[in-house]
Amino acid sequence: MSNINLATLDISEHPNLPSSSAVLFEAKAKKKLSFEAIASAIGRNEVATAAIFYGQAKASAEDIVKLSEVLGIDRFYLESLLSGFPDRGKSVTFPPKDPLIYRLFEIVQNYGYAYKAVMNEKFGDGIMSAISFSTTVEKETDLDGNNWAVVTWRGKWLPYSRF
């Protein structure tokens, strides 16, 4: 028997998620599909795909058709769940309680000003977009057999306007 790691969802622990999340995660678990497999089937990045499941990204009409096919969910039902605009930012309590999400928060808390200083030196006065943005997660194993998470953020640089 293979050991497959699958992200699942206990909706009772996430009352702020949209109703689509429970439907999508239930189908994902039933089909035993990883986000990587679903992303490949719909032609999206795996983090972007997971964001759709958590109601943090908008699914296109094409995404909805492909998700209905890969997950075995009626297309019209899925369309009714996913056709609105995401209500971003409500899914996580603050500060986060989940240890991994808290560590991501902690990285920004500890290194945020350092990131800001280095970016300002490289690009000038501005911000990194979280809208014109992409991210990847890779697994890297070192020579000692230790696994490392490699998280890449790629955001368009937006200089502040002078007015």
From Swiss-Prot:
Alphabetically ordered keywords of this record: Lyase
Gene3D superfamilies xref list: Cyanate lyase, C-terminal domain (3.30.1160.10), lambda repressor-like DNA-binding domains (1.10.260.40)
Domain of life: Eukaryota
InterPro entries, alphabetized: Cyanase, Cyanate_lyase_C, Cyanate_lyase_C_sf, Lambda_DNA-bd_dom_sf
GO biological process, one term: cyanate metabolic process
Single GO term (MF): DNA binding
Enzyme class, first EC level, given as a word: lyase
Catalytic activity: cyanate + hydrogencarbonate + 3 H(+) = NH4(+) + 2 CO2
Enzyme Commission no: 4.2.1.104
Signal peptide location: none
Active-site positions on this chain: 103, 106, 129
Function per UniProt: Catalyzes the reaction of cyanate with bicarbonate to produce ammonia and carbon dioxide.
Family stated for the protein in its record: Belongs to the cyanase family.
Alphabetized PANTHER family for the sequence: CYANATE HYDRATASE
Protein name, entry field: Cyanate hydratase
Source species of the chain: Paracoccidioides lutzii (strain ATCC MYA-826 / Pb01)
